[in-house]
Structure formats: structure tokens, C-alpha cells
Amino acid sequence: MQNVGIVGLGLIGGSLAKTIKLHTPYTVYGTEKNADTMRRAFLMEAIDGELTAETLPQCDVVLICLYPQGIIDYVTAHAADFKPDSLVIDCGGVKQVICDALFPVSQRYAWHFIGGHPMA
């Protein structure tokens, strides 16, 4: 494993980015709709680069740190872009609706979905 992508750099995603950067040799790519948060992530060296259409297919693990519907929307919109055999992990606090929507999507593509939880 070499590259980690993080979608959403708020409290959960930002904390994960900083911890991964501090304790691993992995390259961390991140994306955040709030421009100030994105700028801070770069300034704090929580990410190495922006998660884009070019960098997403390079990621071995992608952590999705959004609200439940945002997780579903992002993963379904980018389902064909994830690297084959990569792990796509949601970090939302609700499981049933997310897992019901995304396990079938992951089965159509060559990546693996994990319904995670930031507190468990």
C-alpha cells in the first residue's frame, strides 16, 4: 500500500489524514468542498496533494468522511474510478442505508467496500 485518499477533511477526515501522515510513509491525497479547510490541510501538512480524477485511481485505500447521503453519492459517482482491489471505507455514523446502497455497487466493480465507523 502506498496511497490513501480521503474525501472530506473535517473533524473525522482531517484527524485521519494527520494521523496517517504522522505514523506511516503513505502518500495522502484529500479533497474538501470548503476551500479554507482544504488550505489548512495543506498548511498543516495533513495531505500531500489533492484527491482528483487523476489521483483517485492511484489510491489503495479511500476513506469517505461525509454525511450518509454524501457518502452514497460520492461512491456511486466514482465507482468506476476506484483502483481495482482497493478498499473503499465509509466513515459515517449510519450503516444500514450506506451498506444497502454500496455493497451492490462494489460487487459490480473490482474494489472492496467496508462499512466502517469512526468510533468503533
Which residues make up each language-model segment?
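Rossmann-like NAD(P)-binding element
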Residues: 54-82, 86-89
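Short amphipathic alpha-helical segments
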Residues: 17-18, 42-43, 74-77, 100-103
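Structured loop/turn residues at beta-strand edges in well-structured enzyme cores
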Residues: 45, 57, 108-111
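Structural motif
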Residues: 7, 31, 65, 89-92, ...
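Conserved short alpha-helix immediately C-terminal to the canonical SAM/SAH-binding motif I
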Residues: 37, 70, 95-98
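NAD(P)+-binding Rossmann beta1-loop-alpha1 motif at the extreme N-terminus of oxidoreductases
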Residues: 1-53
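Rossmann-like NAD(P)(H) cofactor-binding subdomain of soluble oxidoreductases
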Residues: 77-120
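A general structural motif
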Residues: 1, 25, 59, 84-86, ...
